[in-house]
Every structure is written in structure tokens, then in C-alpha cells.
A protein has these predicted regions:
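Surface-exposed coil/turn segments at beta-strand junctions on protein surfaces, enriched
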Residues: 127, 139, 151-153, 165, ...
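Extracellular carbohydrate recognition and processing domains
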Residues: 179-208
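Extended, low-complexity, turn-rich repeat/linker tracts enriched in Gly/Pro/Ser/Thr and Asp/Glu
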Residues: 138, 152, 163-171, 218-221, ...
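Glycine-enriched, solvent-exposed interface loops adjoining structured elements
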Residues: 1-96, 103-106, 186-195, 226-363
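Short, surface-exposed beta-strand/strand-loop-strand elements in extracellular ectodomains
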Residues: 169-180
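Extracellular beta-strand ligand-recognition surfaces/modules
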Residues: 172-174, 200-227
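Extra-cytoplasmic beta-strand recognition segments
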Residues: 98, 132, 141-170, 199-203, ...
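Extracellular glycan-recognition surfaces and repeat-rich motifs
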Residues: 100-132
Length: 363
């Protein structure tokens, strides 16, 4: 993300061509308006010059729905990497990473026990954005729980990381009620003081609602992060097939009415209308499809808008916008110098951001 605002970009170019700067873009006139429009034009030129600029990269997670084969691609996509499609079991936990709060977790503590959000201190370290903290106090029990939607008799896997400042035990309860143990109760002894210890368990759901609960009754604190509950099956990569291959080989089966068309998806294809399709058609609504794509750049409109172009390459935008202004004014010398400067910046950007080290793989 860049640091220069739309107004600052415009004024930098106006200064370069010795024109009056603006206090607000809404008051632009004549050459000022030309420069203002040229800034967006220059940003688009940069964005469109390469398919896979790192600063335009995005990740997308799409939950599946049983019986639904096709899903819309992001509205802002310019290129989708169909070799990156992976199928994962859907995480049933809401806010299991505690990036900025502990929303969706209920405090069932008693006595001096309490739960809270921890964003400072050695737990979590600087590389973490946040964690759920349980504090029992001198005479209480800290309890945090969440109700999950499950399928009866399905097997699930729960995993999470936990740490104590001074060591201790944490209890994980799985049941049909808050802090209930109807399914299982598990005691986690944490020995890696100062670091997160990761554990995982499997369980079989006994109904459509399962409660995951963490409790701690020792007079100290415990931090919990990255809580995941999902169906117990291994993620796998989806094979890309062309739309023609889907039409020739798989469409007759997938568009039929026989339930045999429903299964765990193995293939992905691109449709003719900005969607992707899965084959076989998903048999459950508990899968997540994860993939990578590159987005279109954002058009600047208000004075304070910033661009997607990284700060160290913002001079490329200024040079290309100056080029467009010089062409309009028939200033050939300035236009040529600005275009040369822009090309030099683009070479640097490609070397630093796009060029990749050669890699050879045995086949």
C-alpha cells in the first residue's frame, strides 16, 4: 500500500510541470484536471503491465453448499491461479484466531475467573495478532465456550495452541451444553513455557450442536490461539480441467439427477460467466475452497485515497502522469524524459517483484 494520497500525487506532478497546486481535488481546473485524471491512468498502466504483481495478490476462501456446483469469482479479480485451488474441511469455529477481539466466545467463568483479549506481552509474541486469555484468579474458574453446528455421528478434529507464563494445565471439554463433558474432557499439560504448545483431538458429534469449552482453575493465566474444529479428513489439491473437458467428460454426470453426482470435489474448472465449477458436485456444505487471485487496482477518487502501488515505487506513477500531461501540452522533451524515467522504474519493479529464481524439479 502506498503512502501518497490522491491529492499529493496530483500536486507532485503539478509542481514538476510548474503549475499551481491544489488544496482540494474538487476545485481542479484545466491542466489540474488533466493531471488528476492522469494519476489514475498511470496507476492503471502499472497494474496492467504485469499479471502477477505481488501488491495486487489476494487469497479467497469459498464455502461450498451441498448440491451447488458453481460459485462466483471475486468481483475485483483480474487473474485467477487455477493451479492454487485447495479443498479444506470448513472451520466451524467463529473467530478462532482472535486477531482483534474475542467476539463469539462466551464467558462462563465463576468466582474470580474471567476471560479477555490479550494483544501484548510475551504471550502472544510480536508475530501474533492476539490471543484468548483465561485468568482464574485466587478463587475461581475461567471458562470460555462456543456452540458449534455439527452433524450427528460425524467425526471431527479440534486443534489449538496454548501457553502458560509459568506452566500448568488447561481443560478442553466437548459436550452438548456449555462446559459440558458429555462427549469428552481432556487435560492439557503445558510444559513449553513461553511458547505455544499445539495439540489436537478427535471426537464424534452426538447431535447438531456441540459446545467447545476451555476452562482453567489454577491461579495463573493461559493464552489460547488458532482454534480450529473441522471434519476429520485430509485437505487435497483440486485438479484443473478445461471447460471443454468438463463439457465432454463430466457434464452429463454432474448435471444429472442421480445422487451419485454428489461427492467430495476432485476437479475445478472455469465457466464462461466469471465463475468456477467443482466436480463432482459437493455433497456437503462443510468444505472450504481456498485459492489465490490477483485483483484489479482501486481507482482513486477522494483527496485522501491511497493507491495499491508500494511507497518505494510511487515515483513511477508521478513520472507516467507527468508524461501524459506533457504530451497534452506538446512538450516533447519533458514527455520523452518522463517516459524514460517511467520505463526505468518499471524495470526495477520487475526485477524486484516479478523475476523469479530458476527452479528445476525432477519428474
Amino acid at each position: 500500500m502506498g503512502t501518497l494520497t490522491y491529492l499529493q500525487y496530483t500536486n507532485r506532478v503539478l509542481e514538476d510541470i510548474n503549475e499551481t497546486t491544489l488544496s482540494a481535488l474538487s476545485s481542479s481546473r484545466g491542466i489540474q484536471t488533466v493531471v488528476k485524471n492522469s494519476v489514475n491512468r498511470a496507476i492503471n498502466d502499472i497494474a496492467n503491465s504485469e499479471v502477477e504483481w505481488p501488491f495486487l495478490h489476494s487469497d479467497k476462501d469459498q464455502d461450498t453448499y451441498a448440491g451447488v456446483a458453481e460459485y462466483s469469482l471475486p468481483s475485483d479479480h483480474s487473474y485467477v491461479d487455477f493451479d492454487s485451488f485447495m479443498l479444506f474441511p470448513k472451520n466451524l469455529v467463529t473467530n478462532g484466531t482472535f486477531d482483534s477481539n474475542i467476539t463469539s466466545w462466551t464467558d462462563g467463568s465463576s468466582g474470580t475467573g474471567e476471560i479477555g483479549f490479550n494483544s501484548t506481552g510475551p504471550q502472544p509474541p510480536a508475530s501474533r495478532t492476539g490471543a484468548l486469555r483465561l485468568t482464574a484468579g485466587s478463587s475461581g474458574t475461567a471458562i470460555a465456550y462456543q456452540a458449534l453446528t455439527t452433524t450427528k455421528n460425524k467425526q471431527y478434529r479440534v486443534s489449538f495452541g496454548a501457553t502458560y507464563p509459568s506452566g500448568g494445565d488447561l481443560t478442553l471439554n466437548l459436550g452438548t451444553s456449555a462446559n459440558g463433558t458429555q462427549i469428552s474432557t481432556n487435560t492439557i499439560t503445558i510444559d513449553d513455557i513461553g511458547d505455544f504448545e499445539y495439540v489436537n483431538y478427535t471426537f464424534t458429534a452426538t447431535g447438531t450442536t456441540t459446545y467447545i469449552s476451555f476452562s482453567q482453575s489454577v491461579d495463573t493465566q493461559v493464552d489460547i490461539d488458532n482454534v480450529v474444529v473441522s471434519e476429520d479428513f485430509h485437505p487435497h489439491k483440486l485438479k484443473y480441467i478445461s471447460y471443454d473437458e468438463f463439457q465432454d467428460v463430466l457434464k452429463e454426470r454432474d448435471r444429472g439427477t442421480n445422487v451419485s453426482r454428489l461427492a467430495i470435489p476432485e476437479c475445478v474448472y472455469r465457466t464462461q460467466d466469471e465463475k468456477f465449477g467443482l466436480s463432482p458436485v459437493p455433497d456437503m456444505s462443510t468444505y472450504t475452497i481456498s485459492y489465490e487471485y490477483w485483483k484489479t487496482t482501486t481507482v482513486l477518487s477522494s483527496d485522501s485515497d491511497t493507491s495499491d502501488i508500494p511507497a518505494r515505487y510511487e515515483h513511477a506513477v508521478i513520472a507516467k502522469a507527468r508524461y501524459y500531461a506533457a504530451v497534452l501540452r506538446s512538450d516533447t522533451a519533458t514527455a520523452q524524459a518522463s517516459l524514460t524515467e517511467f520505463d526505468d522504474h518499471m524495470k526495477k519493479m520487475r526485477i524486484e517483484l516479478v523475476n523469479k529464481k530458476d527452479y528445476f524439479r525432477a519428474v
